[in-house]
Amino acid sequence: MENQREEIELTEIPETEKKRTAEEKLLSCSAETAEEKVSLCSEETTDTSSSSSSEQTPAPIEVNVNIQTSTYLPQNAATNLNSLYTSFEDARAQGKGLVRHNSDDLKSFLEKYPPDYRKPKRDLSESWDPGMPKPTLPPRPANLGASQASTVRRHVREQNFKQLRERKANEGKIVKDLKRLEYKVNIILCLVVVILAIILLLTGLSILFIRIKS
């Protein structure tokens, strides 16, 4: 029995080896065919792309441009962006006609402007071009006179606004109370005058009645 089992196992080994070799051959053939297809497709795409690029790409145009003066900038130009940037203060002064911007001026904001640059007194002799005309002063306002001048009235600070409002409210209340008192006093005086007139009439009539009887 043992000899028969060994013979069966020996007969099975060459069959499995044949199957493995057949599978390996199939895999190698499929890989070779796939590589050939990919190479053919890549060659076709390269041919079409080269032909289309040769048809579409125009000849390069040489342009001589001064980067600092012109607004046109070619591609892939090595330019310093700070030379093309104007700060807000420079643009505002340039719009007012005070300063002519210089693109070579690459100083920082703190170096260019001192801490007290917002004050009205500022020396513009360094940045002023002698060829530029001086700005004309605005026309003087008309003389409004003493009655219409803004400095005639007394200026009050904001801290005293509450006190002034309270004073005005108290004054209004006092005026109303005085008016009420005047009205009451007038009514009382009128009543007194009417009573005195009635008394005088009664006394006169009584005197006349007594004389008539006598």
Swiss-Prot record:
Something else the entry says is: In its host, LCK protein is inactivated, preventing T-cell transformation activity.
Q: Give me the stretches of Pro residues compositional bias.
A: 132-141
Q: Which GO cellular component terms, listed alphabetically, does the Swiss-Prot or TrEMBL entry include? A: host cell plasma membrane; membrane
Biotech use, in short, is: Used in cell biology research to transform T-cell lymphocytes. Saimiriine herpesvirus 2 transforms T-cell lymphocytes, including human, to continuous growth in vitro. 2 viral proteins, Tip and StpC, are essential for this function.
How does the record say this protein sits in the membrane?
Answer: Single-pass membrane protein
Q: Does the record carry RNA-binding as a key word?
A: no
- Summary of the function given for this chain in its UniProt record: Plays a critical role in virus induced T-cell transformation. Binds to T-cell-specific tyrosine kinase LCK SH2 and SH3 domains, thereby activating its kinase activity. Once phosphorylated by host LCK, forms a complex with at least STAT 1 and 3, resulting on the phosphorylation of STAT3 and presumably STAT1, and their migration into the nucleus to induce transcription of target genes. Stimulates host ILF3/NF-AT-90 activity. Association with host NXF1/TAP transduces the signal up-regulating surface expression of adhesion molecules as well as activating NF-kappa-B activity.
**What residues form the membrane-spanning segments?**
187-207
Where are the Cytoplasmic topological domains? 1-186
Cellular location(s): Host cell membrane
Extracellular side, ranges: 208-214
* Subunit architecture: Binds host LCK, human WDR48 and human NXF1/TAP. Forms a complex with activated LCK and STAT1 and STAT3.
Does Disulfide bond show up as a keyword for this record? no
Spell out the protein name for this chain.
Answer: Tyrosine-protein kinase-interacting protein
Q: Where is the composition biased (Basic and acidic residues)?
A: 15-26
Q: Which organism is it from?
A: Saimiriine herpesvirus 2 (strain 484-77) (SaHV-2)
Task: Give all Phosphotyrosine modified positions.
Answer: Y72, Y85
From the UniProt record, which GO molecular function terms apply? SH3 domain binding
- Which modifications occur after translation, per UniProt? Phosphorylation on Tyr-72 acts as a docking site for the recruitment of STATs 1 and 3.
Lineage: superkingdom: Viruses
